Amino acid sequence: MKAILAILLSLLSLLSYGQRQQVSLLFVGDLMQHQAQIDAALQADSSYDYDHCFALVKDDIQRADLAIGNFETTLGGKPYKGYPQFSSPDEYLHAIKEAGFDILSTANNHSLDRRRKGLERTLTLIDSAGLTAVGTYRDALDRQERYPLLVEKNGVRIAFLCATYGTNGIGITAPNIVNSLDREELAADIRVARAMKPDALIALLHWGNEYQREPSEEQLDLAQWLIGQGVDHIIGSHPHVIQPIARIPHTEYPTQHAVVYSLGNYISNMSIAHGDVGLVVELVLEKVGTTTRLKSLDSHHVWTERATLSRTGKFRLIPADTIPIDLTSYGHFRMKQALELERQ
């Protein structure tokens, strides 16, 4: 009887070891709020409505197990302002939540646009909305309790790091913290993250040079260094244009490290070449036993229909493979032109 029980336990162990678990992660670029976007969302009753922005993309967002975006503004309260120091209506966050996002990276060069009040109010509202912020913190205790961010989904444990190159020269007011790309700090955070025993470690980095379509030497060097330190995948933002994706072979396992140097803008009022097209990237991670691999990496483009191109006077994200019936002929021309330029 004991022998039979031992065999059964052994079989159960093997079945458990061979069980496949998957998680899909969707990443988008800069969720921006220029003045034209704020003005277009204003309603007759002085409230703001952003639902139109995500109407055509929310199904894709909600299909992912986790959806992550770079929240490149603040919720610092009135007066609402766009560039150069952003503060957006609270309704913008509500629309992001309703669209299906789960995690917002908040460490970027606009984190301190409304100083301490803006940083802390942004975190409070993100928490209240049931979303998760990563990259900025009220104080050291807040950071210690929340960072590195560890999320478990479908039996897969994922740790997230998040840091920025700077904050546009605005000094951090103590005790607030904005994670930086300092290598000593990054190395320490990687050690803490690895001690959590995640199945994958992903770094969300605000880095690179604005409007440059190729990664800088600094980005290339930092990516290699981070992978050497134990980071599995890197997702980049800041340049406001799309940069290449690299697949770097793992040195020990039959898998790859994904390095997305820049996703570009997701939604903004930028009309510069390459500034109105963003990249949406989906990583599928598969865990078998104690090994997790990158099962697939897919990407597609989205185009921002600005208010001046729209029949409704509103902003809207349009997937590259979608031609809405209410898209104006000129809007269709501009969308086609932008996508063709991006694919060159």
Segment roles from a protein language model:
Residues 19-344:
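Acidic, metal/ion-coordinating pockets
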Residues 5, 9-17:
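Hydrophobic h-region of N-terminal signal peptides that target proteins for export
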